[in-house]
Every structure is written in C-alpha cells, then in structure tokens.
Amino acid sequence: MSEVTGDGAVAAEAIDPRRFRTVLGQFCTGVTIITTIDDGVPVGFACQSFAALSLEPPLVLFCPTKTSRSWAAIERSGIFCVNVLAEEQQSTCARFGSRDPDKFAGIDWTESPLGSPILTGSLAHIDCSLESVHDGGDHWVAFGRVSSLSEIREERPLLFYRGQYTGIEPDKTVPAPWRDDLEAFLTTSSEDTWL
C-alpha cells in the first residue's frame, strides 16, 4: 500500500513501479528508433525517451536502459541516428521494441553521413555523435551532438499514449471538443522559441 502525504501525493519511497509507469503513460510521446553500426552490423532499438536538449550547441538526449545490448553497441561506435517514426510505422516500432536478434530483417535503410542507419519511411532523422553519458538510475542519459538533419516531411508522427500507439487527428479544422484549447495552441502563428 502506498503512503499518501497530506496533499494527496504518494511518498517517493513507497512508489510502486507499475503505478509509476501507468502515471508516466499519461504523457503522450513520439516514438524513435535509435540506430548505429557496430562492427559492420546495423543495430537499433525503439526509444520513447528522446528529447531536444540545446540549440547552441545543437544537442539531443535519449535514455537507454543500462542492460540494453543496442546501447552497448552505440557506446562502442560513438555515433547514432535518431529516426523519428511516421504514423504508419507501427510494425517497425514493434520489431525494434522486440528481442528479435535481427531487427533489420526486411527493413530498408540507407547510411547517414556519420554511418548510422536511416530507416526508409521515417518522418525525420537526426545524425549524431555521442557527446557524453550520465547516470540516470536504471537508465543512462546519453547526450548527442547533432551533425546533420533530414529535410522536413508532411506526414504525421507515430505517437504512444497510455500503452498504445496513437496519432494526430487527420482533420485539424474540426477538432474534438476536448481539444479546443490544444488546437488553439498548436495552430498559433507565433515563432517556435520553446527551446
């Protein structure tokens, strides 16, 4: 049983990992595949814990589990490519999120300028060199220095919410009633300066 504080919050030492994961599932994320080449072999894994870190210098971050074999390959190679998945790439995400030993079987890809796989059909890619690695509990926090970026595509992203794949509504001119405020935010014409 969780210990509840006076304000209704659950005390940190009593947090159940399953409940924590369920609460984190309320935060909708994009889905990426982080790739590299390890001794001539393409390696990759599905990753939701990806974020922009800095514009000057251009840095991104992702958080692999400490037991990840794919992470070990990325650390050895010193390079990686973030492949942002498009809405129709659910099966690609499932493959790279599995324990399949040959995740690249049947997956088309090209080589990035630094040498990591760019998955065909990905919405965007960000080619990086490994900048630094920091401890993050049962995960590592890996910083990457951006070397090159893809062109912008008009397709919609694959999203993950409450343990399921989801997407953006195709017709944003008629938002669902609960999206009125979000719609106003997403369609604002002001410059994007959030970073």
From Swiss-Prot:
SUPFAM superfamilies: FMN-binding split barrel. NAD(+) binds at residues 160-163. It is an enzyme of class 1 (oxidoreductase). SMART domains: Flavin_Reduct. InterPro entries: Flavin_Rdtase-like_dom, HsaB, NADH-dep_flavin_reductase, Split_barrel_FMN-bd. It catalyses: a reduced flavin + NAD(+) = an oxidized flavin + NADH + 2 H(+). The keyword Acetylation does not apply. FAD binds at residues 42-46, 48-49, 63-65, 69-70, 95-96. GO terms for biological process: lipid catabolic process; steroid biosynthetic process. The keyword Repeat does not apply. Its EC number is 1.5.1.36. One of its GO terms (molecular function) is riboflavin reductase (NADPH) activity. Pathway: Lipid metabolism; steroid biosynthesis. Catalyzes the reduction of free flavins (FMN or FAD) by NADH. Subsequently, the reduced flavins diffuse to the HsaA oxygenase subunit. HsaAB monooxygenase consists of an oxygenase component HsaA and a reductase component HsaB. Belongs to the non-flavoprotein flavin reductase family. This is Flavin-dependent monooxygenase, reductase subunit HsaB. It comes from Rhodococcus jostii (strain RHA1).
